[in-house]
Amino acid sequence: MKKEFMSRALLLAKKAYEAGEVPVGAVIVKDGEIIAEGYNMREQKQNALSHAEIECINKACEVLKSWRLETCELYVTLEPCPMCTGAIINSRIKTVVFGAYDLKAGSMDSVINLCDYPYNHKPEIYGGIMEDECKEILEIFFQKLR
Protein backbone atom coordinates (compact mmCIF):
# COMPACT_ATOMS: atom_id res chain seq x y z
CA MET A 1 0.00 0.00 0.00
CA LYS A 2 1.59 3.26 -1.11
CA LYS A 3 0.57 6.82 -0.30
CA GLU A 4 1.72 7.94 -3.75
CA PHE A 5 -1.20 6.07 -5.30
CA MET A 6 -3.72 7.66 -2.94
CA SER A 7 -2.09 11.04 -3.64
CA ARG A 8 -2.69 10.49 -7.36
CA ALA A 9 -6.32 9.53 -6.67
CA LEU A 10 -6.65 12.76 -4.67
CA LEU A 11 -5.33 14.78 -7.64
CA LEU A 12 -8.01 13.13 -9.77
CA ALA A 13 -10.63 14.04 -7.15
CA LYS A 14 -9.49 17.65 -7.54
CA LYS A 15 -10.04 17.34 -11.31
CA ALA A 16 -13.58 16.16 -10.60
CA TYR A 17 -14.07 19.10 -8.23
CA GLU A 18 -12.92 21.56 -10.91
CA ALA A 19 -15.41 19.97 -13.34
CA GLY A 20 -18.28 20.44 -10.87
CA GLU A 21 -18.43 16.75 -10.02
CA VAL A 22 -18.50 15.19 -6.56
CA PRO A 23 -14.73 15.05 -5.93
CA VAL A 24 -13.85 11.37 -5.94
CA GLY A 25 -10.82 9.98 -7.73
CA ALA A 26 -9.49 6.46 -8.25
CA VAL A 27 -6.50 4.61 -9.66
CA ILE A 28 -5.90 0.94 -10.36
CA VAL A 29 -2.42 -0.41 -9.78
CA LYS A 30 -0.87 -3.60 -11.15
CA ASP A 31 2.68 -4.68 -10.30
CA GLY A 32 3.41 -1.32 -8.68
CA GLU A 33 2.32 0.74 -11.71
CA ILE A 34 -0.84 2.76 -12.29
CA ILE A 35 -2.66 1.20 -15.24
CA ALA A 36 -5.94 3.14 -15.05
CA GLU A 37 -7.32 6.36 -13.60
CA GLY A 38 -10.79 7.75 -13.18
CA TYR A 39 -12.89 10.32 -11.41
CA ASN A 40 -16.59 11.00 -11.00
CA MET A 41 -18.17 12.00 -14.32
CA ARG A 42 -21.91 11.65 -13.62
CA GLU A 43 -22.72 15.25 -14.53
CA GLN A 44 -20.46 15.36 -17.60
CA LYS A 45 -21.77 12.08 -18.98
CA GLN A 46 -25.29 12.38 -17.51
CA ASN A 47 -24.87 8.78 -16.45
CA ALA A 48 -25.58 7.55 -12.91
CA LEU A 49 -23.02 4.76 -13.39
CA SER A 50 -20.09 7.11 -13.99
CA HIS A 51 -18.53 6.88 -10.53
CA ALA A 52 -14.75 7.11 -10.24
CA GLU A 53 -14.39 3.40 -9.50
CA ILE A 54 -16.51 2.32 -12.48
CA GLU A 55 -14.65 4.65 -14.84
CA CYS A 56 -11.36 3.27 -13.55
CA ILE A 57 -12.42 -0.40 -13.70
CA ASN A 58 -13.61 0.05 -17.30
CA LYS A 59 -10.24 1.53 -18.30
CA ALA A 60 -8.27 -1.20 -16.52
CA CYS A 61 -10.30 -3.89 -18.30
CA GLU A 62 -9.49 -2.24 -21.64
CA VAL A 63 -5.77 -2.02 -20.81
CA LEU A 64 -5.55 -5.64 -19.66
CA LYS A 65 -8.06 -6.91 -22.23
CA SER A 66 -9.73 -8.83 -19.42
CA TRP A 67 -12.53 -8.33 -16.92
CA ARG A 68 -10.52 -10.23 -14.31
CA LEU A 69 -8.50 -7.77 -12.25
CA GLU A 70 -7.44 -10.25 -9.56
CA THR A 71 -3.85 -8.98 -9.40
CA CYS A 72 -4.87 -5.33 -9.16
CA GLU A 73 -5.28 -2.84 -6.34
CA LEU A 74 -7.84 -0.03 -6.34
CA TYR A 75 -7.09 3.25 -4.55
CA VAL A 76 -10.12 5.52 -4.17
CA THR A 77 -10.63 8.69 -2.16
CA LEU A 78 -14.08 7.72 -0.83
CA GLU A 79 -15.41 4.41 0.49
CA PRO A 80 -17.20 2.67 -2.40
CA CYS A 81 -21.01 2.69 -2.66
CA PRO A 82 -23.07 -0.51 -3.20
CA MET A 83 -22.83 -0.29 -7.01
CA CYS A 84 -19.07 0.19 -6.99
CA THR A 85 -18.54 -2.49 -4.35
CA GLY A 86 -20.46 -4.88 -6.60
CA ALA A 87 -18.24 -3.96 -9.55
CA ILE A 88 -15.14 -4.49 -7.39
CA ILE A 89 -16.37 -7.94 -6.36
CA ASN A 90 -17.33 -8.85 -9.94
CA SER A 91 -14.00 -7.72 -11.38
CA ARG A 92 -12.12 -9.66 -8.68
CA ILE A 93 -9.96 -6.71 -7.59
CA LYS A 94 -7.48 -8.04 -5.04
CA THR A 95 -7.15 -5.03 -2.73
CA VAL A 96 -9.18 -1.86 -2.09
CA VAL A 97 -7.63 1.12 -0.33
CA PHE A 98 -9.98 4.01 0.39
CA GLY A 99 -9.58 7.41 2.01
CA ALA A 100 -12.70 8.92 3.57
CA TYR A 101 -15.46 6.84 5.10
CA ASP A 102 -18.92 7.40 3.56
CA LEU A 103 -21.47 7.45 6.37
CA LYS A 104 -24.39 7.66 3.91
CA ALA A 105 -23.57 5.03 1.28
CA GLY A 106 -20.31 3.32 2.26
CA SER A 107 -20.55 -0.37 1.45
CA MET A 108 -17.22 -1.68 2.68
CA ASP A 109 -17.59 -0.58 6.30
CA SER A 110 -19.70 2.47 7.20
CA VAL A 111 -23.29 1.52 6.31
CA ILE A 112 -22.78 -2.13 5.42
CA ASN A 113 -19.88 -4.31 4.37
CA LEU A 114 -21.06 -6.13 1.27
CA CYS A 115 -17.77 -8.01 1.24
CA ASP A 116 -18.83 -9.83 4.42
CA TYR A 117 -21.46 -11.72 2.42
CA PRO A 118 -20.55 -15.10 0.89
CA TYR A 119 -19.93 -13.85 -2.64
CA ASN A 120 -17.41 -15.58 -4.88
CA HIS A 121 -14.71 -12.98 -4.15
CA LYS A 122 -13.62 -10.95 -1.15
CA PRO A 123 -11.03 -8.18 -1.60
CA GLU A 124 -8.64 -7.05 1.10
CA ILE A 125 -9.92 -3.70 2.40
CA TYR A 126 -7.97 -0.84 3.99
CA GLY A 127 -9.91 2.29 4.96
CA GLY A 128 -9.02 5.69 6.34
CA ILE A 129 -5.82 6.12 4.30
CA MET A 130 -5.11 9.88 3.95
CA GLU A 131 -8.61 10.26 5.37
CA ASP A 132 -8.31 13.92 6.38
CA GLU A 133 -7.19 15.07 2.93
CA CYS A 134 -9.84 12.99 1.18
CA LYS A 135 -12.58 14.20 3.53
CA GLU A 136 -11.56 17.85 3.25
CA ILE A 137 -12.16 18.18 -0.50
CA LEU A 138 -15.61 16.58 -0.10
CA GLU A 139 -16.51 18.94 2.75
CA ILE A 140 -15.45 22.00 0.74
CA PHE A 141 -17.44 20.81 -2.29
CA PHE A 142 -20.65 20.24 -0.33
CA GLN A 143 -20.29 23.50 1.64
CA LYS A 144 -20.18 25.38 -1.67
CA LEU A 145 -23.45 23.73 -2.73
CA ARG A 146 -25.28 24.99 0.34
Model-derived features: where do they sit?
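Short beta->alpha transition motifs characteristic of CBS
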Residues: 35-42, 122
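Short beta-strand scaffold segments in enzyme catalytic cores
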Residues: 24-32
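Short, basic and Ser/Thr-rich N-terminal targeting/leader segments
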Residues: 20-24, 70
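Small-residue (primarily alanine) positions within well-ordered alpha-helices
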Residues: 9, 13-16, 26, 36, ...
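Helix-adjacent hinge/juxtasegments
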Residues: 46-50, 54, 58-87
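Residues that line or immediately flank small-molecule/substrate-binding pockets and catalytic motifs
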Residues: 42, 76, 100
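Short glycine-enriched, charge-decorated loop/helix-capping segments at active-site entrances
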Residues: 40-46, 112
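Zinc-dependent deaminase
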Residues: 1-19, 67, 80-146
